[in-house]
């Protein structure tokens, strides 16, 4: 039996860690690759979604005909940005990025990025996050080159993932749920998101996922659970469970 909200086995349901939902005043959109949708054992996009109020998951490989996505992109109350690294990517400290958050008719606010009037008239930031492996992320970009025409946003700082049982292609690569967490923290530092927003549930549920997964893998190695991997050296030794 699976939970139909977090899509994890009932035994390992994580929904209780997602309440109350985080309302950061940001609309997160997750473009979830079909393979990621099937890998709910360790996927973090759905966990991020159930933690974040006003977030949406759009599943697929080809999004050029996705009416929901284009309705969102065409809504002037949102500022859509693609969370994607690159030399042309902004970060939250970039003045040009901050100015984009202001409506075109708010010239008087453009030099007052943290004033009450500027904050009250800001557009809602809408980060678009590709939820997939890095290989599948490239496939989504290949099939949807229009995404690269969106403003790109990346981190102002470097972060390392705590996803201990996954090997990212580069040290600076982080999971979907970590992306949401670090983005909210940087937006708070830039005074774009309110200081009283608590983003910690994202990391709490993520750490619980890691601990549960490693504990289950260790039980398989010990013969306490049926193995689903056959013989694979990655899954035939006891792993240390981090003390977060």
Stretch-by-stretch model annotation:
Residues 1-27:
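Cys/His-rich short segments
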Residues 14-17, 39-44, 94:
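Short, glycine/acidic-enriched capping/hinge loops at junctions between secondary-structure elements
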Residues 27-70:
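Extended interfacial segments that mediate partner engagement and assembly in macromolecular machines
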Residues 35-36, 62, 88, 155-160:
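Short, acidic/turn-prone active-site loops that include or flank metal/cofactor-
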Residues 44-46, 96-99, 140-147:
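"Short basic amphipathic alpha-helical interaction patches in structured regions
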Residues 53-138:
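S-adenosyl-L-methionine/SAH cofactor-binding core of RNA-modifying enzymes
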Residues 126-127, 134-244:
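C-terminal folded domains that constitute the principal catalytic or ligand-binding module
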